[in-house]
Amino acid sequence: MSAANELEEGRALRLDWDKLAKLGARGQRVVPVVLQHADSGDVLFVGYANDEALRETLARRQAVLWSTSRDELWHKGATSGDWLDLVEVRVNCEQNSLLYRVRPRTGGVCHTRGPDGRARARCYYRRVVSERELEFA
């Protein structure tokens, strides 16, 4: 299994404790964004937004994020067709993170695929069972 595939499909816990430090070191001015299904309350995934991504999200009424790996705007669904229509945006008490309450147009949300070959409905598809081990939820 490739390293990327092992990270996304494996059963070993390999948290990236340095993610936020790397963003800061590269001068990326972003805040975390929790994307939540507006009807079920399920957390779909966590992304990042800068001021431009938030502006585009509000204007388009669809989830737009900042891709920290590609250093560019990421209009969720533009490539995959898995659009996330915006219901509302909330900000936390310290104004250092956002909550996008969204409705997926299709069943798919995550860029990973389940055993059936379809995009997963959320990115939280494994649970932590120990300090080193995961299992599929």
Tell me the role of every PLM-derived stretch.
Residues S2-V30, H37-L44, A49-A137:
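C-terminal binding/interaction regions
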